[in-house]
Regions:
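Ubiquitin-like/PB1-type beta-grasp interaction modules and other compact soluble beta-rich domains
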Residues: 2-7, 51
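Short, structured beta-strand/loop micro-motifs enriched in basic residues and often containing a Trp
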Residues: 12-26
Length: 76
């Protein structure tokens, strides 16, 4: 079963299934390592869930909730 990345709390590990965007934002996410099959750890979620601190490929990255919502993931 898949969900959007913005629905997860700290401590979850998920795998990217699909990214639902295109253009500049898609290139930005791909450049940061957000590619299908990559594993993401949700490290911390700020108040109101915005932004989220994520760990991907041993890098810590913060994404806005609106950006995280575009990433479809599955729990691993």
């Amino acid at each position: 079963m898949t969900s959007r990345l913005d629905t997860f709390q700290a401590g979850k590990n998920v795998k990217i299934v699909k990214i639902h965007t295109e253009g500049k934002l898609m290139h930005k996410l791909l450049d940061m390592g957000f590619v299908p099959s990559s594993v993401i750890e949700v490290v911390r979620v700020a108040p109101l869930n915005d932004p989220m601190e994520l760990k991907i490929h041993n890098y810590h990255i913060s994404l806005r909730k609106s950006e995280a919502h575009l990433i479809e993931v599955e729990v691993i």
